[in-house]
């Protein structure tokens, strides 16, 4: 765990949950697993505060607990899961593109709340969608339920593990902490609910003394009975989203290298195996050309012969994204996911070197990568770059840890005159170094965004007050002159300052998302490589 990762975890926890949860979470990230009383003692927080903070972190899957041999419950932070909070906007946007506004709000609610029952999600999303509709229109619960079922069928949401039913005859002492289990076949099984009702608008005139709307409620709440899916909680399956991001990156890479038809064939192969292939698998399931041909999108008019030619072209490509086994029946084709990720990570490194040091350095990097080991004189000859420039470029990349220098002595005394000095590239080491820098960049971006917001806090509060006043006056039917007077409470210089702030914050947000895309590619490559070793 590097200092950059710990700092980023701290910023993310503080931004999402506040200071107390951030203090407990970062303490666990730094120290590893600890029992409750040790956490309270070390952080100087009260037991009640620690318990509440741990409840929040466990509910959002950011902390795990396990029973020690001596019966003590220890809590352990999941740093990698905390860092996934960076990707929340990307998860939500992806769901919007695949399943529309309803799917987007379902995933958003699950991410914001950690775990929820299906009935609670459906009700909340229906209410939110009804708020955005025209007067007189409402969102039916059944429509939201259908979107939820589609997300479960494609494994984007999954059930949370449950406490198993215990035998009532077993009167032994209860365990210090419950053990949560779930059958793999039940992870995506949606409970059969007959949710009848529509979304409701929040209006003061429709609320009773308790603050609850008087509109028609679902049948199961009328009798104050627990919902039929009480105890069955759902969460977002982040691994499935990562699989989708990886597939999109591979399809985009094939489109850039070849053409749109090739990328569509690869997309079809990935779509056919997305449910059957585990996210950590190095290869997809083998597919015949006939299966691929039958699964091509409707209206994609290419003949079987043309498809076979494209598959042969993809299989013969030096990058080896597609592998072929056997020739019977046209052969079986697989996508080599590990090699695809390695190519994407290498391309990312080349791009960074080109941006930082120029095209000549990128040429030298590609050359050393291709030849594995080269002396300085060989680099000069192969790259056709003058000796002085080549030396400067090699030392620049060496000092930044993009390339390595390997010493091979001819004699045991390691005398410089009798030693070969070979330049080489360790892609895994370079990827780790770049990943560390990406974490530092994201932390700097978040701090800058917080600074910009803090500097203009008074102006932002004034703007929000004016907007609230205008909204209430519009609702009561105020005249245009009155609205204009309220609007003029913010002066022209202040309005210009707000526009500048908005533009800067949008740039910082966009930069965070772009850096996170690089982080995802590098993390996927490192994880895939470590599993192969």
UniProtKB/Swiss-Prot annotation:
<dbReference type="GO" id="GO:0045089">
    <property type="term" value="P:positive regulation of innate immune response"/>
</dbReference>
<keyword id="KW-0240">DNA-directed RNA polymerase</keyword>
<dbReference type="InterPro" id="IPR039748">
    <property type="entry name" value="RPC3"/>
</dbReference>
<dbReference type="InterPro" id="IPR013197">
    <property type="entry name" value="RNA_pol_III_RPC82-rel_HTH"/>
</dbReference>
<keyword id="KW-0597">Phosphoprotein</keyword>
<dbReference type="GO" id="GO:0005654">
    <property type="term" value="C:nucleoplasm"/>
</dbReference>
<keyword id="KW-0548">Nucleotidyltransferase</keyword>
<feature type="region of interest" description="Disordered">
    <location>
        <begin position="162"/>
        <end position="181"/>
    </location>
</feature>
<keyword id="KW-0051">Antiviral defense</keyword>
<keyword id="KW-0399">Innate immunity</keyword>
<keyword id="KW-0391">Immunity</keyword>
<dbReference type="Pfam" id="PF08221">
    <property type="entry name" value="HTH_9"/>
</dbReference>
<protein>
    <recommendedName>
        <fullName>DNA-directed RNA polymerase III subunit RPC3</fullName>
    </recommendedName>
</protein>
<dbReference type="GO" id="GO:0016779">
    <property type="term" value="F:nucleotidyltransferase activity"/>
</dbReference>
<dbReference type="InterPro" id="IPR055207">
    <property type="entry name" value="POLR3C_WHD"/>
</dbReference>
<dbReference type="Pfam" id="PF05645">
    <property type="entry name" value="RNA_pol_Rpc82"/>
</dbReference>
<feature type="region of interest" description="Disordered">
    <location>
        <begin position="197"/>
        <end position="228"/>
    </location>
</feature>
<dbReference type="GO" id="GO:0045087">
    <property type="term" value="P:innate immune response"/>
</dbReference>
<comment type="function">
    <text>DNA-dependent RNA polymerase catalyzes the transcription of DNA into RNA using the four ribonucleoside triphosphates as substrates. Specific peripheric component of RNA polymerase III (Pol III) which synthesizes small non-coding RNAs including 5S rRNA, snRNAs, tRNAs and miRNAs from at least 500 distinct genomic loci. Part of POLR3C/RPC3-POLR3F/RPC6-POLR3G/RPC7 heterotrimer, coordinates the dynamics of Pol III stalk and clamp modules during the transition from apo to elongation state. Pol III plays a key role in sensing and limiting infection by intracellular bacteria and DNA viruses.</text>
</comment>
<keyword id="KW-0808">Transferase</keyword>
<dbReference type="Pfam" id="PF20912">
    <property type="entry name" value="RPC3_helical"/>
</dbReference>
<keyword id="KW-0238">DNA-binding</keyword>
<dbReference type="GO" id="GO:0051607">
    <property type="term" value="P:defense response to virus"/>
</dbReference>
<keyword id="KW-0804">Transcription</keyword>
<dbReference type="InterPro" id="IPR036388">
    <property type="entry name" value="WH-like_DNA-bd_sf"/>
</dbReference>
<keyword id="KW-0539">Nucleus</keyword>
<dbReference type="GO" id="GO:0006351">
    <property type="term" value="P:DNA-templated transcription"/>
</dbReference>
<dbReference type="GO" id="GO:0032728">
    <property type="term" value="P:positive regulation of interferon-beta production"/>
</dbReference>
<comment type="subunit">
    <text>Component of the RNA polymerase III complex consisting of 17 subunits: a ten-subunit horseshoe-shaped catalytic core composed of POLR3A/RPC1, POLR3B/RPC2, POLR1C/RPAC1, POLR1D/RPAC2, POLR3K/RPC10, POLR2E/RPABC1, POLR2F/RPABC2, POLR2H/RPABC3, POLR2K/RPABC4 and POLR2L/RPABC5; a mobile stalk composed of two subunits POLR3H/RPC8 and CRCP/RPC9, protruding from the core and functioning primarily in transcription initiation; and additional subunits homologous to general transcription factors of the RNA polymerase II machinery, POLR3C/RPC3-POLR3F/RPC6-POLR3G/RPC7 heterotrimer required for transcription initiation and POLR3D/RPC4-POLR3E/RPC5 heterodimer involved in both transcription initiation and termination.</text>
</comment>
<feature type="compositionally biased region" description="Basic and acidic residues">
    <location>
        <begin position="211"/>
        <end position="227"/>
    </location>
</feature>
<dbReference type="InterPro" id="IPR008806">
    <property type="entry name" value="RNA_pol_III_Rpc82_C"/>
</dbReference>
<dbReference type="GO" id="GO:0005666">
    <property type="term" value="C:RNA polymerase III complex"/>
</dbReference>
<dbReference type="GO" id="GO:0003697">
    <property type="term" value="F:single-stranded DNA binding"/>
</dbReference>
<feature type="modified residue" description="Phosphoserine">
    <location>
        <position position="194"/>
    </location>
</feature>
<dbReference type="Pfam" id="PF22536">
    <property type="entry name" value="POLR3C_WHD"/>
</dbReference>
<comment type="similarity">
    <text>Belongs to the eukaryotic RPC3/POLR3C RNA polymerase subunit family.</text>
</comment>
């Amino acid at each position: 765990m590097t200092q950059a990762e710990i700092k980023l975890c701290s910023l993310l926890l503080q931004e999402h949950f506040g200071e107390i949860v951030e203090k407990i979470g970062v303490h666990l990230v730094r120290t590893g697993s600890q029992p409750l009383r040790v956490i309270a003692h070390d952080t100087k927080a009260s037991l009640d505060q620690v318990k509440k903070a741990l409840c929040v972190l466990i509910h959002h899957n950011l902390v795990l607990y396990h029973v020690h041999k001596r019966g003590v419950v220890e809590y352990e932070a999941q740093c990698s899961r905390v860092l996934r909070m960076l990707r929340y906007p990307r998860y939500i946007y992806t769901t919007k593109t695949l399943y529309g506004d309803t799917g987007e709000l379902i995933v958003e609610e699950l991410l914001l709340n950690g775990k929820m029952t299906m009935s609670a999600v459906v009700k909340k999303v229906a209410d939110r969608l009804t708020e955005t509709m025209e007067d007189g229109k409402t969102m039916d619960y059944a429509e939201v339920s259908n979107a939820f079922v589609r997300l479960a069928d494609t494994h984007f949401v999954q059930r949370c593990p449950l406490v198993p039913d215990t035998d009532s005859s077993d009167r032994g002492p209860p365990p210090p902490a419950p053990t949560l289990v779930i059958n793999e076949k039940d992870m995506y099984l949606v409970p059969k609910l007959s949710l009848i009702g529509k979304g409701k608008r929040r209006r003061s005139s429709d609320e009773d003394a308790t603050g609850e709307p008087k509109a028609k409620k679902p049948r199961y709440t009328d009798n104050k009975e627990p919902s039929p899916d009480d105890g069955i909680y759902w969460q977002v399956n982040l691994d499935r989203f990562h699989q989708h991001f990886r597939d999109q990156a591979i399809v985009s890479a094939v489109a850039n290298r070849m053409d749109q038809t090739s990328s569509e064939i690869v997309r079809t192969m990935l779509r056919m195996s997305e449910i059957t292939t585990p996210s950590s698998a190095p290869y997809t399931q083998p597919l015949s050309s006939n299966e691929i041909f039958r699964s091509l999108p409707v209206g994609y008019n290419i003949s079987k012969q043309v498809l076979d030619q494209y598959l042969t072209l993809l299989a013969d490509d030096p990058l080896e994204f597609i592998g072929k086994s056997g020739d019977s029946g046209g052969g079986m084709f697989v996508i080599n996911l590990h090699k695809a990720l390695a190519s994407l990570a290498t391309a990312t490194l080349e791009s960074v070197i080109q941006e930082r040091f120029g095209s000549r350095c990128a040429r030298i990097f590609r050359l050393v990568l291709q030849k594995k080991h080269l002396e300085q004189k060989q680099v000069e000859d192969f790259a056709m770059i003058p000796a002085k420039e080549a030396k400067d470029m090699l030392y620049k990349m060496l000092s930044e840890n993009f390339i390595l220098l390997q010493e091979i002595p001819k004699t045991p005394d390691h005398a410089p005159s009798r030693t070969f000095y070979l330049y080489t590239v360790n892609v895994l080491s370079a990827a780790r170094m770049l990943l560390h820098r990406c974490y530092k960049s994201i932390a700097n971006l978040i701090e800058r965004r917080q600074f910009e917001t803090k500097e203009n806090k008074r102006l932002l509060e004034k703007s929000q007050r004016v907007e609230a006043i205008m909204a209430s006056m519009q609702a009561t039917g105020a005249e245009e002159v009155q609205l204009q007077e309220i609007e003029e409470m913010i002066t022209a210089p202040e309005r210009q300052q707000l526009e500048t702030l908005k533009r800067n914050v949008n740039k910082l947000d966009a930069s965070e998302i772009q850096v996170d895309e690089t982080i995802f590619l590098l993390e996927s490559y490192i994880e895939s490589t470590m599993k192969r070793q």
